[in-house]
């Protein structure tokens, strides 16, 4: 079937901010889809609220709207653009839900906009739990015994009929949001209440738990001519009961017999045909390990996280082809872009094993509930490719960047057997490491299989690794054993540890013995056809398939898995850097380990190495490719942390040199640099012991800001107000040592702002200054940033520009740098300097129209700023106001406190732009799903130090029609100062009128809660914040953010005046 000619303009809805359950995979799929549609000659209009994406670059679609993905704004854009069609299946759950809302509100019908790809009825049948159940029954496809409920009472009634355990699955939510496992009525009531609240259609499916079955996924494609194929099947290491996004996954499936594979494959193809899905679809199935009995768990009628994984695992570009199918092309007429000789109708074949491992945020959220279940908790993932399971698993392990290079974590030797077995039974994020430890202690596979329901086949592969560890320990420096373990994916570092020598010795020994990796091609066809893909993975085998060209090359290191503090922004910078390298006439080589991102799309670079970002793996690529140099600036802390070892190995690091990176990161050197440049900084000291820290704090005076050196995202950063808290911090939060000093600074309460700059060694370009709405003390990544600055005087701006120039030249920066300032009493202090790309780069690139990563890369390669058209120093400010607002994933992370402070907690960001601050703020809050009505009830429960300021804030909220509720201490202060309040209790006080109940019953429209540093662990305040998060009530833990929201509400309010 030829492509459709009756449509010309197509709107694509993106997935919005990155949250747990919906990450960078949708930037990858959305970018692919937009380019695919443009390739076919269609005009593409894109709507997305996330500025950190490649998808929202001007050249990806014909028209790009970075606007809130809400019914109000998408409708306005539809009315303005009048597209012929809408493609909603590439924007994750956000895109699907928006399409449903547009349809239900009659907008699509009114504007005559057709839905492309999957029809609304199919989305409904897959997403609406009741319709899905009916369809499965019609197809004779087995599903677990279940009931659709719209109330908690109905859930209890069903539970009484069939008993526990049960699983709750809310309709139309993402990443298992609001769902969970229930072993009793109390849990059922709690989870169902939350689930009904979070489901946009107030509907949950309550089903019999089939926890313990094998979880298998099929990624399938279908076109309008009913051609359908399986792109890839995948098997979860963890059984049903743990969300697939939180599970280790292998592709292809490893333990299925031919009969089982055929059974599940047929079911998946029957389902996609019955739903008449046109495009990609993910089918999740549960298989009884002891029989051929299976159940269909769910169907995602769209491109998903698993689609991105399947695309990278096979090389088959699902989103690109789904877009072509949506406009009428069929699989048998589209050429496979990898082989360039076969058609997309050929099912991919794999001659390797892919392992995906989730990356969890518990290194930042130590208080978080680590127990895994049906609600997703991972922020990102890594993928590794090997010739056997052991190799791919160990490569994935060391890609995670959690301080491990093997299936062993520190201090496990000291764990008692009881604790070990309990950790294995509980299924937390680190269970894999405890399983390996149990095997080291000779627990049987049968025992571990019965405790975990993990297939014995996988446990046996872990045993192989453990037995090889033993073999290594008993045969020190044995070359044959070395060869054997390298074939199974052991790292040089792990071998060095077992042999009690250093990594360099293992590396040299291996190279002398000729034990070197070769690089194999990912070609979708198991080498059956010729392939032109420059997409490689390492393995210890014969025949290297990565051919070296005569062209001079540059290697760019990516940023690895998405985690809090290092998100998709760094991937954005990496992709733009590669573009500039290619434009400059070099061969661009990318090395990265993240299957979700645009940078690991094989068509972006001249060569892609899908490998862990460790010294060993990077050096192996460098030894083969011999690039002119390596660029580290765009890979976040991941790449920067490799600088020292790469430099020592004689690798040419392009851009700012190691000694200058050290001058920015090393406290004493940085202080000396600032003194020499005559730039003020808050007084501070370095401490390597607890006593040094206490002495430093006494000299500075409390409060002090304490943090470890060399971190990203404010990891383990804290404001400390007394000696007791400081001693507690030094003994629990950090392990201070001469190699890992702790930085102790005076905490200045002032206005914070930051600058991204590009330096060529002689001149600098500052695209813009961003002013933070929240005062210093809230991490810059969690602050709302405004560009251009709204309250900074000309003198302050001139000082910031002057200090930026001095620092860029003084630190010999070549390329990107980010500087953070605090302004107190009209004096500018430098807080920190990062001589690399920062997370604000995409936002600033979008709003200034300066492709910063590209300019910086060309400067790194030797170009000068005078050769560009942007001039020097501060670039002229935009006449619009732009706001970057953080987005959080607290609903997914039980026990994680939502109180903002110096340690970063946000997972994503949105942008709001308009002609003035109030309108831009309104859009930013709406895009971040922080909506407040024009009037209602607002609770104040604030720290003593904030009461004076909170009083003024409460007065203005009252002036626009809000009723002020307050807890006792706050209410007494407000009443004494002439403000009438409604007294409410915290917990256990004023039983009928305490805050969590009021929130639950919909009586409260917003909560303002600030806490002094000494009361951070206050249990009542924690529960109040948690209640607000769980019920979706706007929560402000900074008075500055609450004041910004007031400005929005005030701008929407009319003035009511009595006639004089």
UniProtKB/Swiss-Prot annotation:
It comes from Streptococcus agalactiae serotype Ia (strain ATCC 27591 / A909 / CDC SS700). This is Carbamoyl phosphate synthase large chain. It comes from the Bacteria. Residues 1-401 are annotated as: Carboxyphosphate synthetic domain. Mn(2+) 2 binds at residues 298, 300. Transmembrane segments: none annotated. Mg(2+) 1 binds at residues 284, 298. The keyword Manganese applies. HAMAP family: CPSase_L_chain_A, CPSase_L_chain_B. It catalyses: hydrogencarbonate + L-glutamine + 2 ATP + H2O = carbamoyl phosphate + L-glutamate + 2 ADP + phosphate + 2 H(+). One of its GO terms (biological process) is 'de novo' UMP biosynthetic process.
């Amino acid at each position: 079937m030829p492509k459709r000619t009756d449509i010309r303009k197509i709107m694509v809805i993106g997935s919005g901010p990155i949250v747990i359950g919906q990450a960078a995979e949708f930037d990858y799929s959305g970018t692919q889809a937009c380019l695919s549609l443009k390739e076919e000659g269609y005009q593409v209009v894109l709507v997305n609220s996330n500025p950190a994406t490649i998808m929202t670059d001007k050249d990806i679609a014909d028209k790009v709207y970075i606007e809130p993905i809400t019914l109000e704004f998408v409708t306005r854009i539809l009315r303005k653009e009048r597209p012929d069609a809408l493609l909603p299946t590439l924007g994750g759950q956000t895109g699907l839900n928006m399409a449903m809302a547009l349809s239900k509100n009659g907008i699509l019908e009114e504007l005559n906009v057709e839905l492309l790809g999957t029809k609304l009825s199919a989305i409904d049948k897959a997403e609406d739990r009741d319709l899905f159940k009916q369809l499965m029954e019609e197809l004779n496809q087995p599903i677990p015994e279940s009931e659709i409920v719209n109330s908690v009472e109905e859930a209890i009634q069903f539970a009484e009929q069939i008993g526990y355990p049960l699983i709750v699955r809310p309709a139309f939510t993402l990443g298992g949001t609001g769902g969970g496992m229930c072993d009793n009525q109390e849990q059922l009531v709690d989870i169902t209440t939350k689930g009904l609240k979070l489901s946009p259609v107030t509907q949950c499916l309550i089903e019999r738990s089939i926890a313990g079955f094998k979880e298998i996924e099929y990624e399938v494609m279908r076109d309008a001519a009913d051609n359908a194929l399986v792109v890839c099947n995948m098997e979860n290491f963890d059984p049903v009961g743990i969300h697939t996004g939180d599970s280790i996954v292998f592709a292809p499936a490893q333990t299925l017999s031919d009969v089982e594979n055929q059974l599940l494959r047929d079911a998946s193809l029957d389902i996609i045909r019955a739903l008449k899905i046109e495009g990609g679809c993910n089918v999740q199935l549960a298989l009884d390990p002891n029989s051929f009995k299976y159940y269909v768990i769910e169907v995602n009628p769209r491109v998903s996280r698993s689609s991105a994984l399947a695309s990278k695992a096979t090389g088959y570009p699902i989103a690109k082809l789904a877009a072509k199918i949506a406009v009428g092309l069929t699989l048998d007429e589209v050429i496979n872009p990898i082989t360039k000789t076969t058609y997309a109708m050929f099912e991919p074949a794999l001659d390797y094993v892919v392992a995906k491992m989730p990356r969890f945020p518990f290194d930042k959220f130590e208080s978080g509930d680590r127990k895994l279940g049906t609600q997703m908790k991972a922020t990102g993932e890594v993928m590794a490719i090997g010739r056997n399971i052991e190799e791919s698993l160990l490569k994935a392990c060391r890609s995670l960047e959690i301080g491990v290079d093997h299936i062993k974590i520190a201090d496990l030797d000291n764990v008692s057997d009881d604790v070990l077995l309990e950790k294995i039974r509980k299924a937390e994020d680190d269970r894999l490491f405890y399983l390996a430890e149990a095997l080291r202690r000779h627990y049987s596979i049968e025992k571990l299989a019965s405790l975990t329901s993990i297939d014995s086949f996988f446990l046996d592969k872990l045993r192989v690794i453990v037995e090889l560890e033993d073999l290594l320990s008993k045969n020190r420096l044995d070359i044959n054993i070395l060869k054997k373990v390298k074939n199974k994916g052991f790292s040089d570092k792990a071998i060095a540890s077992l042999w009690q020598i250093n990594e360099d010795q293992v590396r040299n020994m291996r190279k002398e013995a000729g034990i070197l990796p070769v690089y194999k091609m990912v070609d979708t066809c198991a080498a059956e056809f010729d392939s032109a893909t420059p997409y490689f993975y390492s393995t210890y085998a014969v025949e290297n398939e990565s051919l070296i060209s005569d062209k001079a090359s540059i290697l760019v290191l990516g940023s690895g898995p998405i985690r809090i503090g290092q998100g998709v922004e760094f991937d954005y910078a990496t992709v733009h850097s590669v573009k500039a390298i290619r434009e400059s006439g070099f061969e661009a080589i990318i090395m990265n380990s993240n299957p979700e991102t645009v940078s690991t799309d094989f068509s972006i670079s001249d060569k892609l190495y899908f490998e862990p970002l460790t010294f060993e793996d990077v050096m192996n690529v460098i030894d083969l490719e011999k690039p002119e140099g390596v660029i580290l600036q765009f890979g976040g802390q991941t790449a920067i942390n490799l600088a020292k070892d790469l430099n020592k190995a004689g690798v040419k690091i392009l851009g700012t040199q190691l000694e200058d990176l050290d001058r920015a990161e090393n406290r004493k050197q940085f202080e000396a640099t600032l003194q020499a440049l005559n730039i003020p900084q808050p007084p501070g000291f370095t401490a390597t012991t607890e006593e040094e820290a206490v002495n430093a704090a006494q000299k500075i005076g409390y409060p002090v800001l304490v943090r470890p050196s060399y971190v990203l995202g404010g990891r383990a950063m804290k404001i400390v107000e007394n000696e007791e808290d400081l001693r507690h911090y030094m003994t629990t939060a950090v392990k201070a040592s001469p190699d890992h000093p702790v930085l102790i600074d005076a905490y200045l309460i002032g206005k914070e702002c930051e600058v991204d700059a590009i330096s060529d060694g002689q001149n600098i370009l500052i695209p813009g200054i961003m002013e933070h709405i929240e005062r210093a003390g809230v991490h810059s990544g969690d602050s709302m940033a405004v560009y251009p600055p709204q309250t900074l005087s000309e003198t302050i701006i001139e000082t910031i520009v002057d200090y930026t120039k001095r620092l860029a030249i003084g630190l010999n920066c070549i390329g990107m740098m980010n500087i953070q300032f605090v302004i107190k009493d009209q004096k500018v202090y430098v807080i920190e300097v990062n001589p690399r790309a920062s997370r604000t780069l995409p936002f600033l690139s979008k709003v200034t129209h300066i492709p910063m990563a590209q300019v910086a890369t060309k400067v790194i390669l030797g170009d000068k700023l005078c050769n560009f058209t942007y001039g020097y120093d501060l670039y002229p400010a935009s006449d619009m106001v732009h706001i970057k607002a953080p987005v959080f994933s607290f609903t997914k992370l039980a026990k994680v406190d939502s109180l903002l402070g110096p340690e970063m907690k946000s997972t994503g960001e949105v942008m709001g732009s308009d002609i003035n601050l109030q309108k831009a703020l309104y859009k930013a809050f709406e895009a971040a799903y922080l909506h407040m009505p024009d009037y209602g009830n607002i609770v104040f429960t604030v720290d003593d130090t904030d009461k004076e300021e909170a009083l003024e804030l409460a007065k203005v909220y009252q002036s626009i029609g809000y009723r002020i509720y307050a807890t006792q201490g706050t209410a007494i202060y407000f009443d004494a100062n002439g403000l009438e309040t409604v007294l409410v209790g915290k917990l256990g006080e004023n039983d009928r009128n305490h805050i969590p109940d009021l929130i639950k019953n919909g009586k409260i429209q917003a909560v303002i809660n600030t806490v002094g540093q000494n009361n951070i662990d206050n249990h009542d305040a924690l529960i109040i914040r948690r209640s607000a998060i769980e019920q979706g009530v706007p929560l402000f833990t900074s008075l500055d953010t609450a004041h910004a929201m007031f400005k929005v509400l005030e701008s929407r309010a009319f003035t009511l005046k009595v006639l004089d």
